[in-house]
């Protein structure tokens, strides 16, 4: 907990407190860091570019609008997952960071997630999707230019608004009719990247179950695509293997108070024990649309993964061993209505008597 600097343990009834203390002591003890291995990308840059072009072709043929493709880095892990989490939290603090260890499953998850899947409190359900990312600049002037470029990017804004519409639709299935609104639009600045972030929220409908709310939003639209079912089919075909923890969710649910808060597991390290060795896996990617540039998509995946690979193995996710720029965190509110700036990309369309109906099966219809 950020305010109390404490960690809550979630367990089962009738478990001895001494067992919990023993477990916590073993796992939270500070281990001496050892010389790490270097992560290996499971696919080459050229393979990543090829798969990006495959997705673009699927979009041009009308099968899908957007697909979030992920690439994997993998290597043995000499340090325990808690040490990695501690280092990552210092180097790349994030609002929805989380850590989990299951000895029986031989599995640990370390995450510095900046993204919220859902929050339910006082009868209001909220989701805060991220879509649109740029690396930080090397100085304040370049950093401001990066933000300006992101705000004016037609591609990023189009992707983001498509996602906002998708989340509004998904929330509508568990909210009171007419209560779902796009309530906030902002730039969230993290140590290594700037993100375009929105908040979509609504009043939970009478009789709606928490499980229904989770089902309506999971998996998040930002890490699948649109429409979801077709996007996930393409992802399954091109990625070829399970994502593991990446793009899953971790958080807390209080059945007594009805409060829930769940993240989306991006910027995440997945650790599995195989043959008595810890094997770490990191995935990163981005949303592919019709005008995506394959080489740019490859670079985006690499600098998204970079903070995790450096904290885990002390090595970059890309060939050039250059330290990416870092800066202070912050939030910049963005306008949610048409702007007087002629160069801005927010356009108010005139009302017309004709409409086009597009049925996207499992996502949204407009």
Map each language-model feature to its residues.
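Extended alpha-helical targeting/anchoring segments
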Residues: 1-346
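Two-component His->Asp phosphorelay active-site signatures
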Residues: 361
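Localized chelating/binding microdomains
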Residues: 349
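Conserved hydrophobic helix-helix packing surfaces used for dimerization/oligomerization
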Residues: 355-356
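Phosphate-coordination loops involved in phosphoryl transfer and adenosine-cofactor binding
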Residues: 352
């Amino acid at each position: 907990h950020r305010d109390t600097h404490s960690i809550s343990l979630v367990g089962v009834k009738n478990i001895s407190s001494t067992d919990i203390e023993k477990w916590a002591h073993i796992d939270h003890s500070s281990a001496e860091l050892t010389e790490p291995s270097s992560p290996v990308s499971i696919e080459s840059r050229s393979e990543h570019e090829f798969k990006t072009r495959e997705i673009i072709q699927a979009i041009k043929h009308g099968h899908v609008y957007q697909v979030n493709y992920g690439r994997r880095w993998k290597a043995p892990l000499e340090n325990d997952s808690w040490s990695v989490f501690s280092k990552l939290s210092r180097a790349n603090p994030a609002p929805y960071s989380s850590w989990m260890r299951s000895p029986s499953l031989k599995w640990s998850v370390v995450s510095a997630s900046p993204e919220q899947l859902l929050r339910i409190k006082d009868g209001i359900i909220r989701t805060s999707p991220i879509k649109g990312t740029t690396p930080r600049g090397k100085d304040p002037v370049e950093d401001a230019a990066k933000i300006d470029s992101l705000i004016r990017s037609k591609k990023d804004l189009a992707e983001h608004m498509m996602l906002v519409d998708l989340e509004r639709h998904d929330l509508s299935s568990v909210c009171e009719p007419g209560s779902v609104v796009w309530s906030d639009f902002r730039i969230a600045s993290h140590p290594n990247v700037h993100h375009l972030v929105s908040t979509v929220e609504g009043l939970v409908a009478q009789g709606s179950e928490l499980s229904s709310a989770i089902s309506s939003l999971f998996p998040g639209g930002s890490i699948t695509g649109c429409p979801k079912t077709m996007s996930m089919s393409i992802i399954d075909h091109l990625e070829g293997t399970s994502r593991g923890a990446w793009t899953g969710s971790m958080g807390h649910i209080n059945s007594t108070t009805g409060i829930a808060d769940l993240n989306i597991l991006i910027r995440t390290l997945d650790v599995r024990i195989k043959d008595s060795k810890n094997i770490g896996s990191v995935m990163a990617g981005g949303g592919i649309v019709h005008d995506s540039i394959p080489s740019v998509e490859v670079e985006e995946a690499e600098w998204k993964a970079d903070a995790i690979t450096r904290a885990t193995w002390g090595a970059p996710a890309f060939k050039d061993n250059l330290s990416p720029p870092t800066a202070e965190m912050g939030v910049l509110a963005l306008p949610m209505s048409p702007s007087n700036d002629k160069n801005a990309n927010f356009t108010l369309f005139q009302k017309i008597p004709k409409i086009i109906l597009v049925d996207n099966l499992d996502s949204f219809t407009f």
